[in-house]
């Protein structure tokens, strides 16, 4: 997950509203992590990122 923090720092570090919603942040990172694994749902991850 640390790799995602490097590429998407605003998801976990920069925005004050993110600090108030760590569960939502964890959910987004979990979706992105799932997309990285073989057979993961890339479409879902792209929708979240977009």
Swiss-Prot record:
**Keywords of this entry:** Cell membrane, Lipoprotein, Membrane, Methylation, Pheromone, Prenylation
Q: Where, per UniProt, does this protein localize?
A: Cell membrane
Lipid positions (S-farnesyl cysteine): 47
A GO CC annotation given for this chain: plasma membrane
Pfam families according to UniProt: Pheromone (PF08015)
Q: What is the recorded membrane topology of this protein?
A: Lipid-anchor
State which residues form the propeptide.
Answer: 48-50
Q: In its UniProt entry, what is this protein called? A: Mating-type pheromone BAP1(3)
Q: Which gene encodes it?
A: BAP1(3)
């Amino acid at each position: 997950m640390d790799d995602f923090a490097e590429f998407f720092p605003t998801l976990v570090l920069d925005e004050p509203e993110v600090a108030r919603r760590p569960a939502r942040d964890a959910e987004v990172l979990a979706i992105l992590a799932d997309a990285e694994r073989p057979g993961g749902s890339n479409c879902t991850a792209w929708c979240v990122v977009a």
